[in-house]
Structures are given as structure tokens and as C-alpha cells.
């Protein structure tokens, strides 16, 4: 699977990704695969594990952080994560092959409650991952600031410039650290819907993302990452957000599909 820069209109681009997801999902006879498509969720059977302050709203959307207005001039740390309850087979130890995957999600950040801080991240981490200690505010609920041992890969949407960050708000690819290996500018518009498509192409070991703004503009970012050297062969995927000042983070949709050729399917193809 390859990823290319595109001039397609937003609707057509998202439709194309939907077709890719369907095609991958229908190829499960020869591979170990996982797929899901979350739109409006219910507490009865969401397929999502919530941690910290994350919850399902009455509208069926996912709120990652507390959204209640804080008293004037008073701010409180809030961090929350939503993870797929199912584990993702990432690579096969017998064949050495890694999975390719496509995930897409859409979200709204509302910054009307106060100054803007912190941000949101899509992350891949070892199974059983929980919110680390010392991981609030700039560490987005994925990094323990008191240790150098953090194991994850992520795509962050950073709203606040810390000492290690580039100038301005940015989108970054993170590998075991909140210091991004590659960044592009993040053009946040409070209250607008942002759509994200992330593709990992196993043959080229390339993680690529397209960020589609409500006005139709698209940003892209990519990085070569051999996930086998970073993560265990089974992982969990999730979305996390943290803030100190009261902006809200809501997830409006989330889909995922992966494929992994295992030992059995590899032998059957010889």
C-alpha cells in the first residue's frame, strides 16, 4: 500500500479511503485482520475502553477531557484516553512481516473556555497501556515526564509551544518521546471539524498522514518507521488529550483496518 500527495476534494478523498478500508477488511481469509468503524457510540456496546476523564456524550461522541466550564481564572488538569478494546496484531515473529493499516478519525477542539494549551494525540502502544504517571498537560497522557522509558508511536496535534517544540502550533510524529521527529504546521480553527487519515505501509515502513481541514485544505506528513523495532507484535491503539485551561476535545468518528500475513497464510501461499 502506498501513500501519495493528492489534489482530490475532501469528500472524494475520504470516500477513497473508505473504499481502501472495505477492500482490506474483505481480505481476511489470507491474513490476520482487525477492523472497526465507530460513529455514534453507546455505553452498552461501544468497543472502546475509556481512561481518565474520557467518556461517551449523550450525542454519541467521545469527549476526551472534561468539558464543564471552570470558574473564572481557575483551571484544572484534565486528561483522558479512548482505546480500541481489541488488540491489534502488528507484526508476526515467525515471518518478520509487519501489518499495514489505515485509520481515520475526525475531531473538534473548542478553545472558547480559556487560553489554549496542550493537545491531542493518536497513539500505538503495548497492550494493557494505561495513563502514565506525570503525563498530564504537555505530555498528552502518553509520556511519563519523569522517565526516559516510554514506548509508543503517535501523531500529535500540539496547541502550545513548549521548550522542545518548534515555533507555533504543529502536527508531529512521535516515537517514544513527546519531542517530535518530524512536524508540520497545525492550522487550528476552534470549533471546526478536522479529519485525519493515517496509513502505515508495511513494505516501505512508512507512516503517512493527511490532515483535512473543514475549509478543504490538506496538510501531509510522513516518516519512515520500522514498527517492529519500536513496538511489540501486539498493540493497542487509542486517542488521548490533555489540557490545563479548559479547551474541549471531542471525537466524532473513528475507523481502523489492518492486515497481517501470518505464518499459516504465508505457508499456504508458497
Curated annotation (Swiss-Prot):
One of its GO terms (biological process) is biological process involved in symbiotic interaction. Induction: By infection with the endomycorrhizal fungus G.versiforme. It is found in: Symbiosome, Peribacteroid space; Symbiosome, Peribacteroid membrane. Glycosylated in a boron-dependent manner. Glycosylation is required for localization to symbiosomes. 3 different glycosylation variants, NLEC-1A, NLEC-1B and NLEC-1C, have been identified. It comes from the Eukaryota. InterPro entries: ConA-like_dom_sf, L-lectin, Legume_lectin_dom, Leguminous_Lectin. Expressed in nodules of Rhizobium-infected and uninfected roots and in the root stele near the nodule attachment point. In roots which have been colonized by the endomycorrhizal fungus G.versiforme, detected only in cortical cells colonized by the fungus, mainly those containing arbuscules. Glycans are attached at residue 134. The keyword Lipoprotein does not apply. Keywords: Glycoprotein, Lectin, Membrane, Signal. Residues 34-41 form a propeptide. Involved in symbiosome development. PANTHER family: CONCANAVALIN A-LIKE LECTIN FAMILY PROTEIN, OS10G0129200 PROTEIN. Belongs to the leguminous lectin family. This is Nodule lectin. It comes from Pisum sativum.
